[in-house]
């Protein structure tokens, strides 16, 4: 008996397909796909969300001091002349950061194995690299999705049947986070 569906693809194609669909589900909250794919994606997504729920509070806050370049009103670095050279002026800033404990770090690395990095491009800058930003989906899992499902014991996703696809009559479904 097989542990998973083969989806009519080679192993590398299947893994890439499932990873991309899990990434899309976590990023957007819902995807439309075939029933067989949805059942496989559901398994993977549920495991990631369970990991996030277990490890969401497993961090410590640490105070860190960092040197940051001083900036003027226009946002440019302030320069100072020292021994005939222009040198950037730095100021020390105290910040509080979240430091993952070992179990949460391991969970983060397990999630990064499955999820692709997502680059968000604003519609005004479509096709350009300027103003793009990468979205950290592991942080989204820990900070947004895990607190939402904190009191829930599994069943984080729902499959809703839409109907048959026109081209090949495959059953299409909507897979969404509950």
From Swiss-Prot:
The source's domain of life comes to Bacteria
Q: Which UniProt keywords apply?
A: Ribonucleoprotein, Ribosomal protein
Determine if Ligase is one of this entry's keywords. no
> Can you cite a GO biological process for this protein?
translation
Q: Which GO terms describe its cellular component?
A: cytosolic large ribosomal subunit
Citing just one GO molecular function, the answer is:
structural constituent of ribosome
Cite the record's note on assembly: Part of the 50S ribosomal subunit. Contacts protein L32.
- Tell me its family: Belongs to the bacterial ribosomal protein bL17 family.
Provide the protein name: Large ribosomal subunit protein bL17
């Amino acid at each position: 008996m097989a542990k998973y569906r083969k989806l009519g693809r080679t192993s590398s194609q299947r893994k890439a397909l499932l990873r991309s669909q899990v990434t899309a589900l976590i990023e957007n909250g819902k995807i439309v796909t075939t029933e067989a794919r949805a059942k496989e994606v559901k398994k993977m997504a549920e495991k990631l969300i369970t990991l996030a729920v277990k490890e969401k509070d497993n961090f410590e806050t640490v105070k860190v001091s960092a040197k940051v370049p001083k900036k003027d009103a226009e946002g440019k670095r302030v320069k100072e002349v020292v021994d005939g050279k222009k040198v950037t002026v730095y100021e020390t800033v105290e910040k509080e950061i979240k430091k993952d404990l070992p179990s949460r770090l391991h969970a983060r690395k397990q999630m990064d194995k499955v999820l692709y990095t997502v680059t968000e491009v604003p519609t005004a800058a479509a096709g350009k690299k300027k103003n793009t930003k990468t979205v950290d989906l592991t942080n989204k899992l820990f900070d947004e999705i895990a607190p939402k499902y904190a009191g829930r014991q599994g069943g984080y996703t729902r499959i809703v049947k839409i109907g048959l696809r026109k081209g090949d009559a495959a059953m299409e479904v909507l897979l969404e986070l509950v």
